[in-house]
Every structure is written in structure tokens, then in C-alpha cells.
Amino acid sequence: MTQGVLPFKYEEEKKESGITALGGLPIYLDLATVMGIGESIEKHLHIKQQGWTDKQMILSLLLLNLAGGDCVDDLEKLEGDDGFCKVLRRVEQKVMKRRERRELDRRWRKERQRVVSSQSPVFRYLAAFHDPEQEKQRIEGKAFIPVPNEHLRGLMKVNSEMLAFIQGRNPQKVARLDQDATLVET
């Protein structure tokens, strides 16, 4: 397979170590780079000041979704795949300039051990998109759509830029929203 934008290519591995079951995900990292998703996240989201960056959080959640993750706990599946973690480390090192890598290192109080965030920081991150004041306006038994807060509006801008990229290359007049019809008992 030809090499894309990011510094990886697919090769047959003779050893057992470094093998990944998530070999298709780096192609999506390549697509995210071409689409400028990272830059869009950096431009519109300013939630994290320490530790994991907004870009790392959002891309981790996107990759989790693409890998078939059902919940935040499934981030452990990404972290537990040694081959995938090696690819992520290499991509992170290659796409950042030296100054950016140093700034990233300074965000951490302790040395970073993981490639993908654990569930606790992700839950705290996701909580930033929720406005508890809006919940006070909820009426029991009625549908309720809260007014988006600053962070959710930023995420909406990231989503708009992703759609603009796609629309710019393959214009469509109709968009279909596919919903899973699976019944879940509550």
C-alpha cells in the first residue's frame, strides 16, 4: 500500500510483538491530517490546559468510535494494543515540531505513560460540554434540547469544518442520517 501523508506504511511483520488488530485506524489518522481536523480542534476548542490536549482527546474518541468502541471504558482496548500504540507514538512525534513536542511535555506534571487517555480524564473532558444550569429548565416527560455552551459550539464548528472539507470534494444535495434500529430494554 502506498504511503499517505503520515509517516507509516503497512508491512508484513515476521515477529509477534508490535502486531495490531487495529491496523485500519492509521488510515483514518491520515484522513484526519489531510482534513485538518487537528488544526480545527486547536482553533475552536480550548478546554484542556494541562495533561491531554483537546486534539488528543477528540481524536482518541474518534478512533474509539471507528474501532467499534461502545463506551469510554473501551479506550483500554486501544491502549492495550501494543502495535497501535507504537503507531500513535510515532505519528505524534513525526507530525509535531520539536518546539511543539517540548510544549506537550510541559503540560504534564509527571512523565506521560499512556498513548491514549484513561476513562477518568475523558469523563471530566466530556463534562465540559454539559451545562448543569440548562438541566434546571428540563420538564419531566418532555423532550429537551439544551442551549449549547461555549465548548459545544466549538465542537460544532469543528464538525462544520469537517463537513465543509467533505462537501468541497464530493458535493451532495441530500444527507441521510442513519440510525440504529436496535431495541435496548431500559
Per-segment meaning from a language model:
Residues 1-186:
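Dynamic "connector" segments at or just before major functional cores
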